[in-house]
Amino acid sequence: DPWGGIATPRLPRRLPRVLEVEQVARLLAIVEADLDPVPGDDPERAALRSALAFRDRALVETAYAAGLRISELASATLGSLEIRRGELRVMGKGRKERVGLLGRPACQAIADYLAEGRPVLLERRTDASEVLPPEIFLNHLGAPLGVRGLRYRFDRLCARAGLPVGVSPHTLRHSFATHLLDGGADLRVVQELLGHENLATTQVYTHVSPGRLQSVYREAHPRARRLSTP
């Protein structure tokens, strides 16, 4: 084989797209604003609008707080949720279970949705079965909100927030990891939270945190401090 001794070129690894903290805040502001009542809405329409707003806020808060894949978000069940402990058990790739952690804003958003939003959506079910769906997140007809529905809703929210075209639910997962590293989190802890089997998969996020690299460099290198400008 004349080509046997020739190594194939290695393609550069594509770096993930990441949102700035301010951009995530804009997205969250959009879902918060949707909770405000719209003057002139009839009661039924107002109830549905409010229920979907509670759901969307819980969706975004949960996705960002726990760094979930979209499939994990869609399949999350009530039985896997421990609000008091701030934990959500999810089934990741390879049928491997892990625990996603939820901060106070995410826990509050989920609690509000379960109390004010989900019951309204369940009332709109067209399924005659008495068995209620175990999934946490439901669509406007009280059925489980699937991956396609999640993507569609997320696209609409991102467009309204003025975020770049192409931002996806997975972008929030990338942002979750990068913001943790920027905040000083240990790489192996982030690996565990993301459910990555190999540390090398998580290390890609170290290449998209220039702010963190600059900070560590300035603190560690004896001649890294810049001269002050007159």
Annotated model-derived regions:
Residues 1-230:
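Conserved catalytic core of the tyrosine transesterase superfamily
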